[in-house]
Amino acid sequence: MRAIDFHVHLPTPDWLDVSMKGYIEAAESYFRSKVVRRTIDELAGDYEAIDVMAVLLAWDAETATGRPRVPNEVVAKACREHPKTFAGFGSVDPLKGDFAVGELDRIVSLGLKGVKLHPSLQAFRPDDERFWPLYERCEELGLALLFHTGTSGIGAGQPGGQGIGLDYARPIRLDAVAAAFPSLNVIAAHFGYPWHLELLAMALHKTNIYIDISGWAPKYIPAEVIREMKGRLQNQFVFGSDYPFIQPQRCLDELKGLDIPPAVLQKVLIDNGKRLLGIA
């Protein structure tokens, strides 16, 4: 296995053309790429061809957006059908309260490894203590939490950003979460840009904060992020692409040009991800 891609959205028409309808066009412009629709089997074949494991992400922002979710069961089914190629994270809508907390047990029973949350799209502030029961149950169940942080390709370049607020996704909002739940692995996606220095300081302070580098072509990742990934935080970074918006092969190719020592690259591409997923 060459890598674990920790940030893979389903490229199926059900998600892209229904749940994400109207968002995709802005995202394509932001990423300067055309999003290609693929079936689950085609996606598995694509990742098998490059010898990369994909962590598939469910999605639930029904309360804030009114859009249909990507069910946890869909991700779990893909993982069962392609166990050597896929692992999965479920999703819950924090605004659903007790229902969301109860759904966490279902996520575990489905064999999923963590939970994906998108504060900007779900319109919630992660440091609001109303959501403490959700984090507490994740900690009890051993579920990692992957938060979208920083700016968003969804809504980018549109009037009002299509109503999406970036302040929800400030990395500092995860600091209180990581402090209150020290056994909870908190993964900050997209390294929190433009607040990446804030996130780097948090990760240096709290070893249960991890950072994924998805959503950016590696050659554009800020130098401060690369420096800490090579150095003090090499055990807390994980590889990710943000597929289908960015192709994993491009990310792997560009990482080679960043002068990252092979032992460090092994950690970022594989070892740290394995530890978070609990796989040998």
PLM features: residue spans?
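Active-site environment of divalent metal-dependent phosphoester hydrolases
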Residues: 11-14, 61-64, 94-98, 151-155, ...
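A generic "structured core" feature
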Residues: 2-11, 107, 134, 146-148, ...
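Amphipathic, non-transmembrane alpha-helical secondary structure
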Residues: 37-48, 69-76, 80, 98-109, ...
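Mid-to-C-terminal alpha-helical segments outside catalytic/metal-binding sites
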Residues: 1-49, 53, 105, 233-238, ...
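Catalytic pocket-lining loop regions of alpha/beta-barrel enzymes
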Residues: 113-114, 127-238
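A cross-domain feature marking catalytic cores of carbohydrate-active enzymes
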Residues: 8, 58-59, 90-94, 117-119, ...
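Active-site gating/metal-coordination segments in enzymes
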Residues: 53, 61-156, 165
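Conserved, mostly hydrophobic/aromatic
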Residues: 7, 75, 88, 107, ...
